[in-house]
């Protein structure tokens, strides 16, 4: 049994790219400046891989950008929600369709609706882009739960990560993908869902439906440097980092 202090000299992160790209690097730098405790590797292999890395002792922290299952909760002693992500549904910036309902999204992502003309758009085939369905990505699972009701995805073009999906949609007038709003770039537009725009205010007000927790997990009860970092992540300074692109936990 590893003690919590095992990783004290080299804190490491593996897991969701949403957390690993947009939060951990800046938070780790500030934490190191304040405490002298530095991070080693910061990975982005996805939520499932990060969870396994934490449970197997290969990473101090696993990052999961979705709700934990009951089985997962039983495997970890430490879990801290550091914020909430706004999930966006992105289309090409020139597409005239600006809003859809969750029921309409289900028709599209299940493969039952395959042309934008069904949604008052142009007569143009719909191409769904997604991170790899079998890759253990939090976005894939969260969207499947919140929009598809855990039914299977229809035909999709599978890519390695959210950045790739967004890049393809920016170049494809018929493309659509689900991803964290933190990955938004010029050339794409995020749809309003159920009449609510994907803004932090709409999530905080409860009108925008696609919201998910950002969680750091540890196998053992955190102590030493691990506990210090988790405590730090809930301080105003760290929550300000979270708040740049996400909804802070505090």
Each PLM stretch: what is its role?
Residues 1-250:
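Exported/periplasmic ABC-transporter solute-binding proteins
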């Amino acid at each position: 049994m590893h003690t919590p202090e095992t990783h004290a000299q080299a804190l490491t992160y593996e897991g969701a790219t949403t957390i690993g790209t947009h939060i951990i690097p800046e938070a780790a730098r500030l934490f190191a400046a304040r405490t002298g405790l530095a991070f080693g590797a910061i990975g982005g292999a996805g939520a499932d891989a990060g969870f396994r890395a934490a449970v197997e002792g290969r990473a101090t922290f696993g990052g999961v950008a979705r709700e934990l299952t009951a089985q997962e909760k039983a495997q970890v002693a430490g879990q801290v929600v550091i914020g909430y992500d706004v999930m966006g549904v992105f289309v090409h910036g020139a597409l005239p369709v600006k809003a859809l309902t969750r029921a309409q999204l289900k028709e599209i992502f299940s493969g039952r609706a395959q042309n934008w003309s069904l949604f008052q758009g142009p007569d143009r085939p719909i191409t769904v882009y997604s991170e790899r369905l079998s890759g253990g990505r939090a976005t894939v699972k969260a969207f499947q739960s919140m929009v598809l009701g855990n039914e299977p995805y229809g035909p999709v073009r599978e890519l390695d990560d959210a950045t790739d999906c967004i890049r393809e949609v920016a170049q494809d007038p018929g493309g659509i993908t689900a991803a964290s709003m933190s990955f938004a770039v010029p050339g794409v537009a995020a749809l309003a869902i159920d009449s609510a725009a994907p803004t932090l205010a709409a999530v905080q007000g409860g009108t925008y439906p696609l919201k998910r927790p950002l969680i750091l997990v540890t196998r053992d009860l955190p102590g030493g440097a691990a506990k210090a970092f988790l405590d730090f992540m809930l301080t105003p300074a760290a929550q300000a980092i979270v708040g740049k692109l996400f909804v802070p936990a505090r």
